[in-house]
C-alpha cells in the first residue's frame, strides 16, 4: 500500500536528513529502554534505541522569539506532563512523582523546554541564528502563478503582501480544526485535537489553484486517541482534552454495554475499535466510552494535571461506592460493567489478560507501574469507583493529504509534479507509510521530506541558473 518511491526516499534518506540537522545544531538523544511498538512481534523491531527525542532546550536563547513560539498544553501526557519533561522521564512519572516534580521545578527555573516545544524552540533558534526571515500573524492567502508556482500572497495586520519565490513548501499541518474536513475524511463528528487551532486544512485550499491531487490512507492507521477533559481548561476556544494512555493498573475502558474493547495499555489496539462502525446495527458499538478506575488508582497516580492528593474538579467524573451504582450514574449497562470488572479483576490478580493481552508488550510496560509484577495490570477493588466520559482526540495525523512525489513535489490531477510547489508533514498524504502507525511518524516525515523538498527546490534553481547538478550528501549516516 502506498508509494514505493516515497517509502524508499524516507528509509534511505532519513539518516542523511537527521545528520544534516544535527550538524546545524539540533539536539537529539535516543530514549533508552523504550521499545518499538511492535517489539518483539514485528521482524526487525528493537527493544530500545530507535526513538530519538529532543534534548531540553533553554528558551532564554530565543530572545524575543521565546514569546512567539508555542508551548505545548500538556495534552500528550498521561501523568504529569507539560513541556518540562522528556519522554524518557514521563515513563518514570508513575513510580517517582516526587522526583519528577523536582525535575519540573528545576527545568522551569532554567527556562528549559522539552518534547515538541523543545524541538520547535531549537529549530527556531537555528533559523534565527542564520538570519532566516520568520513572519508571524501572516497567513498564506493564495499562491501566485499559472503554469508554475512563483510565490504567494500573505495577509497581515495592515495589508496583503505579494512574496515572489522560486518554490513554496506547504507545511500547514492537517485539518483537525475543520469539522467539515474531519467529517468528510475521518467519518466522525465531535473530534477534539491536540494541535493548534490554526490546523484547518489550508493546504487543500492553496493547492487547489493548481488542481492538486489528494490521496488517502485507512483512517484506522491514523493516530486516533481518546482523552479526558478537566473542567475549566480550554484550547482555542474549545474544551481541552488531554490524551490518555491507560497503561497503569486499576483501570479499564468500557463502552455503554460495560464491555472492554481493546488493550488499554496499547492505544493502537483501541484507536481503531473505538471508531469502528457496526453496519448491522448501524451504530458505533464502542462509542461513547468511559475511563473507569478505583480509589487505588486515584490515590497512586495523577490524572492529567491532577495530582493523587488533589480532588477531581466537580463534574469531571461520576463517583459511587459500588460498580452497579457507578454504572447507573454514567448510563452504562450495570450487569455488563459488573461482569467485566469481575472478570478483569480475577485475571489481573493472576497478572494476565486473556481477552486483550494487556501488559504483554514491552512498549506498554514502559508506561505502566514498574513496581508491580505486571506493570499494566491491577484489580479495581477499592471504593469509591470513578467513571470519566472520554472524548475523541486527534493528533494532527490525517487520513487525507496532498499527493506528493519522493521529494515532496505536489502532484496534480494529470499525475505531473506542480513546478515550484511542495507539501510536507501532515499536509502531505502518508503514502510512504501505508496504514501502520508509530510514535514520531509525523515529526520524522516532516523533517525528512522537508529536507528533501528544500534540496530539490534549491537544486532546480541551481540547475536553471548554472546548468549543473547540486551534489548530494548521500553517504552521511547516523
Regions found by a protein language model. Give the residues of each.
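C-terminal structured subdomain/cap of oxidoreductase catalytic cores
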Residues: 159-164, 306-310, 396-464
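An anion/pyrophosphate-binding glycine-rich loop and adjacent beta-alpha core
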Residues: 63-93, 204-336
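Conserved redox-cofactor binding core of oxidoreductases
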Residues: 9-159, 227-228, 341, 348-379
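A glycine-rich dinucleotide-binding beta-alpha-beta segment and adjacent secondary-structure elements
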Residues: 141-148, 336-431
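Short Gly/Pro-enriched turn/cap motifs at secondary-structure boundaries
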Residues: 195-196, 240-245, 267, 281, ...
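Short, solvent-exposed loop/turn and secondary-structure capping segments
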Residues: 33, 40-43, 179-183, 434
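Glycine-rich loop(s) and the adjacent beta-strand/alpha-helix scaffold that form part
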Residues: 110-117, 129, 156-232, 278, ...
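Helix-rich C-terminal "cap"/substrate-channel and partner-interaction subdomain
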Residues: 282-386, 453-456, 460, 467-478
Amino acid at each position: 500500500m502506498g508509494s514505493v518511491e516515497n517509502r524508499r526516499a524516507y528509509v534511505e534518506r532519513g539518516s542523511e536528513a537527521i545528520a544534516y540537522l544535527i550538524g546545524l545544531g539540533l539536539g537529539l538523544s535516543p530514549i533508552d529502554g523504550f521499545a518499538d511498538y511492535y517489539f518483539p512481534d514485528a521482524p526487525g523491531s528493537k527493544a530500545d534505541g530507535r526513538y530519538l527525542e529532543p534534548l531540553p532546550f533553554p528558551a532564554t536563547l530565543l530572545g524575543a522569539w521565546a514569546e512567539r513560539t508555542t508551548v505545548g498544553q500538556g495534552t500528550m501526557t498521561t501523568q504529569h506532563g507539560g513541556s518540562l519533561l522528556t519522554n524518557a522521564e514521563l515513563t518514570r512519572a508513575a513510580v517517582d512523582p516526587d522526583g519528577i516534580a523536582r525535575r519540573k521545578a528545576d527545568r522551569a527555573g532554567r527556562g528549559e523546554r522539552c518534547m515538541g516545544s523543545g524541538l520547535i524552540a531549537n529549530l527556531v533558534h537555528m533559523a534565527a541564528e542564520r538570519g532566516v526571515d520568520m513572519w508571524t500573524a501572516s497567513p498564506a492567502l493564495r499562491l501566485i502563478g499559472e503554469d508554475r508556482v512563483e510565490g504567494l500572497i500573505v495577509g497581515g495586520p495592515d495589508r496583503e503582501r505579494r512574496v515572489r519565490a522560486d518554490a513554496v513548501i506547504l507545511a500547514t499541518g492537517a485539518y483537525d480544526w475543520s469539522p467539515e474536513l474531519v467529517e468528510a475524511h475521518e467519518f466522525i463528528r465531535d473530534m477534539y485535537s491536540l494541535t493548534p487551532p490554526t490546523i484547518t486544512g489550508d493546504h487543500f485550499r492553496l493547492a487547489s489553484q493548481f488542481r492538486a491531487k489528494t490521496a488517502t490512507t485507512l483512517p484506522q492507521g491514523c493516530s486516533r486517541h481518546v482523552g479526558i477533559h478537566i473542567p475549566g481548561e480550554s484550547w482555542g476556544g474549545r474544551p481541552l482534552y488531554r490524551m490518555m494512555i491507560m497503561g497503569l493498573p486499576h483501570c479499564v475502558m468500557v463502552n455503554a454495554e460495560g464491555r472492554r474493547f481493546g488493550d488499554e495499555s496499547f492505544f493502537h489496539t483501541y484507536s481503531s475499535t473505538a471508531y469502528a462502525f457496526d453496519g448491522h446495527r448501524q451504530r458505533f458499538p464502542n462509542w461513547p466510552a468511559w475511563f473507569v478506575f478505583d480509589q487505588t488508582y486515584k490515590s497512586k497516580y495523577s490524572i492529567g494535571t491532577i495530582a493523587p492528593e488533589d480532588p477531581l474538579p466537580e463534574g469531571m467524573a461520576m463517583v459511587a461506592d459500588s460498580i452497579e451504582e457507578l454504572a447507573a450514574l454514567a448510563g452504562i449497562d450495570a450487569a455488563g460493567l459488573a461482569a467485566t470488572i469481575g472478570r478483569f479483576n480475577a485475571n489481573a490478580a493472576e497478572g494476565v489478560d486473556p481477552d486483550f493481552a494487556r501488559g504483554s508488550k514491552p512498549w506498554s510496560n514502559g508506561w505502566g507501574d514498574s513496581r508491580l509484577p505486571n506493570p499494566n495490570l491491577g484489580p479495581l477493588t477499592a471504593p469509591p469507583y470513578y467513571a470519566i466520559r472520554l472524548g475523541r482526540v486527534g493528533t494532527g495525523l490525517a487520513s487525507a493529504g496532498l499527493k506528493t512525489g519522493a521529494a515532496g513535489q505536489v502532484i496534480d490531477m494529470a499525475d505531473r509534479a506542480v513546478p515550484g510547489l511542495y507539501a510536507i508533514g501532515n499536509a502531505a498524504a502518508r503514502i510512504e507509510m501505508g496504514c501502520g502507525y508509530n510514535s514520531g511518524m509525523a515529526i520524522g516525515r516532516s523533517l525528512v521530506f522537508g529536507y528533501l523538498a528544500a534540496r530539490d527546490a534549491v537544486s532546480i534553481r541551481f540547475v536553471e541558473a548554472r546548468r549543473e547538478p547540486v551534489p548530494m550528501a548521500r553517504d552521511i549516516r547516523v
